[in-house]
Regions:
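N-terminal hydrophobic/helix-forming segments and targeting peptides
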Residues: 1-197
Length: 197
């Protein structure tokens, strides 16, 4: 088992912050707070960019990265409390691309009342009846299960159509490799942070 390093710890911290497209605020806040310890000036602009000016005598350089990640949003809430999901990014084919391989993955729902853990599930024939096999997944076959059994309970947390969802697997080491979600582009944010320090 590989020994954790400061860079691994930094990547783990950044990749485990939920920040689906359109709701990257927690990532921006972490960067602004952390970068202010080594920069002359740090700000979050009106359009959501985090800018840190480090200063110095040498030539000016710019390090760029983005903080969002692939995410989902709630399309509807079923009467029995399951959440129909849809991709945040435009999906031309109407079904999950190879970018999504989240069967039975943990997720975090960014509800109005705060983050709520859930599980992304696929409606198998045992659940929806008929047992028919499909040659591809459709978005209508995917749900998030929060462990509640009523629409009213789920909605009481401030969960509604448009609420964002981020995948939530742990970032970990497999041999010499780091695996997890949001590596694109939180690894670059980790490098920018390390360079700034």
């Amino acid at each position: 088992m590989a020994t954790p390093t400061p860079m691994f710890d930094l990547i783990k911290t950044l990749t485990e912050i939920p920040g689906p497209t359109g709701q990257e605020d927690l990532v921006h806040e972490w960067c602004a707070d952390h970068w202010s310890s080594f920069s002359e000036h740090t700000e979050i602009t009106r359009v959501g960019n985090v800018v840190a000016r480090v200063g110095g005598e040498g030539p000016a350089i710019v390090i760029l990265a983005h903080g969002d990640e692939l995410g989902l949003m709630i399309k509807s809430v079923t009467e029995n409390g399951l959440l129909h999901v849809w991709p945040v990014a435009r999906d031309m084919r109407g079904r999950p691309s190879y970018s999504y391989s989240p069967v039975n993955q943990p997720v975090i729902v960014l509800a109005d009342s705060g983050p709520i853990d859930g599980q992304l599930v696929y409606a198998s024939g045992h659940v929806i009846g008929g047992g028919t096999q499909k040659d591809h997944f459709e978005w209508n076959d995917w749900f998030v299960d929060l462990g509640y059994t009523s629409k009213e309970k789920v909605e009481s947390f401030g969960i509604h159509p448009g609420t964002r969802i981020a995948l939530n697997p742990p970032t970990r080491r497999l041999g010499d490799t780091i695996v997890g979600k949001a590596m694109d582009n939180r690894a670059a944010l980790s490098i920018a942070t390390s360079v700034g320090e």
